[in-house]
């Protein structure tokens, strides 16, 4: 690798920008990882302290942290655990609450097909860790998940967590030990003992080194009735979930709008938290609270915006260093 110092810096900044775009993760989604970590006697307090995660947040399932922080948390857990299949083993801790309101919506659907139809509209409530796609394959169907995280090791464990949790939760919903036809994993073929572990969880043909991460199963399973469904409760939960998705999207827009306003205001000098809150017609405290709910804080957004502007100026290379420092 013959990258110059400047190229390496640019690449590092590009990766940092990618990490900044990891969205959010619900506290509910984090719990599975922490339950396995506690079972393995990992030092969760020390890990949270190292990455700057406030443990108080973790007691409220309605809260969110940034995707970047979630990725750091999983990386830190993996570094401390000797479990090569940590992600796969988290699936045993899945419960309706792991999927936020989506979990309770799923419980009140009529059948498995209806459950799957609810994933895409509401998966944002669980977090922005990945995107689910669902496609027919003749007499079979394929449900695949594309992880949006950037750390390859974290991604592998997240994929295992996601697919194994889906299957474990689906079996719980229908009280029926149906097995998929095939599991496709992008990871390379692991050791024989690890292959046996995948086999024990999924109980089907497992293909490694694939171009996607997906579960394939018979179409007939979509009509399996759920043993716990309540259609009246379902519509109430869906209305609630729709308003939560709307609020989450609005809050993400707040962060984007704030970045835009900061960029404008850095040129005028009125860029303090109080100034920004006034622009949005809210108090500084409210702004602080809404940013905290996104796993963000005002100072880090200000620093990021300054850095982005400096990089933009450097890229244009028409401004000399004196002009940059004066801003």
Language-model features, listed with the residues they occupy:
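Short acidic/histidine-centered micro-motifs embedded in hydrophobic/aromatic stretches
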Residues: 50-54, 186, 327
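Short hinge/gating elements
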Residues: 100-106, 148-152, 222-223, 243-245
């Amino acid at each position: 690798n013959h990258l110059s110092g400047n190229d390496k810096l640019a690449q590092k900044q590009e990766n940092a920008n990618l990490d900044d775009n990891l969205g959010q993760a619900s506290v509910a989604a984090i719990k599975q990882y922490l339950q396995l970590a506690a079972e393995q006697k990992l030092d969760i307090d020390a890990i949270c302290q190292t990455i700057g995660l406030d443990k108080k947040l973790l007691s409220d399932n309605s809260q969110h942290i940034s995707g970047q922080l979630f990725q750091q948390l999983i990386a830190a857990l993996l570094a401390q655990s000797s479990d090569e299949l940590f992600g796969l083993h988290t699936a045993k801790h899945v419960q309706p609450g792991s999927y936020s309101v989506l979990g309770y919506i799923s419980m009140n659907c009529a059948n498995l097909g209806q459950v799957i139809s609810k994933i895409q509209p509401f998966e944002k409530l669980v977090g922005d860790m990945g995107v689910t796609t669902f496609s027919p394959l003749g007499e079979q169907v394929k449900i695949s998940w594309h992880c949006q995280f950037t750390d390859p090791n974290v991604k592998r464990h997240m994929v295992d967590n996601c697919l194994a949790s889906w299957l474990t939760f689906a079996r719980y919903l229908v009280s029926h030990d149906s097995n998929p036809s095939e599991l496709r994993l992008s990871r390379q073929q692991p050791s024989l003992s690890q292959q046996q572990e995948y086999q024990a969880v999924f109980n089907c043909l497992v293909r490694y080194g694939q171009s996607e991460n997906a579960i394939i199963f018979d179409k007939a399973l979509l009509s399996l009735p759920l043993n716990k469904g309540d259609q009246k409760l379902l519509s109430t939960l869906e209305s609630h979930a729709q308003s939560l998705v709307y609020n989450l999207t609005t809050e993400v827009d707040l962060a984007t709008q704030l970045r835009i306003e900061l960029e404008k205001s850095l040129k005028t000098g009125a860029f303090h938290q109080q100034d920004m809150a006034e622009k949005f017609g809210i108090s500084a405290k409210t702004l602080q609270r809404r940013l905290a709910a996104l796993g963000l804080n005002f100072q880090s957004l200000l620093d990021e915006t300054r850095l982005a502007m400096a990089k933009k100026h450097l890229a244009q290379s028409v401004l000399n260093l004196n002009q940059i420092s004066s801003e």
